[in-house]
UniProtKB/Swiss-Prot annotation:
Subunit structure: Homodimer.
Single annotated GO MF: rRNA (pseudouridine-N3-)-methyltransferase activity
PANTHER family named among the record's database cross-references: METHYLTRANSFERASE, RIBOSOMAL RNA LARGE SUBUNIT METHYLTRANSFERASE H
Record NCBIfam families: PRK00103.1-4 (NF000986), tRNA_RlmH_YbeA (TIGR00246)
EC number: 2.1.1.177
Spans traversing the lipid bilayer: none
Designated name of the protein: Ribosomal RNA large subunit methyltransferase H
Xref: Pfam families: SPOUT_MTase
Species of origin: Pseudomonas syringae pv. tomato (strain ATCC BAA-871 / DC3000)
Family: Belongs to the RNA methyltransferase RlmH family.
Amino acid sequence: MRLRLIAVGSRMPKWVEEGWHEYAKRMPSELALELVEIPLNTRGKNADVARFIRQEGEAMLAKVQPGERIVTLEVQGKPWSTEQLAVELDRWRLDARTVNLMVGGPEGLAPEVCARSEQRWSLSPLTLPHPLVRILIGEQMYRAWTVLSGHPYHK
């Protein structure tokens, strides 16, 4: 099974790439953690933001193969504790489908992406910077795996 983070935005600072890779390399090979970056359309003061969101959504969905699970990260999603995330991760693992975790751009996800979502997850009611979200997701996936495997990382 693969866990794939599909996120709008590229060219992240080095600390973001290092943070993401640190947790991705800790994951076992049977739960590979992969990052797919969707380029962010340049926003100007007269930008057609609705069109950009739609284009970004189309690009995100183009990375998803038929039958794969889509989990959107949304403010209105369901908050999961670490233990609840571990339960979800175990369900996903038993389901054996690739899980695509979708993170939109500054204005959020396209409605078409949300409509395809099987689950909606909220990391926090706080507004989080997108670079930090990548690291948080990587760390939380690793932490959930350690809960399932009895590893002492999560105490």
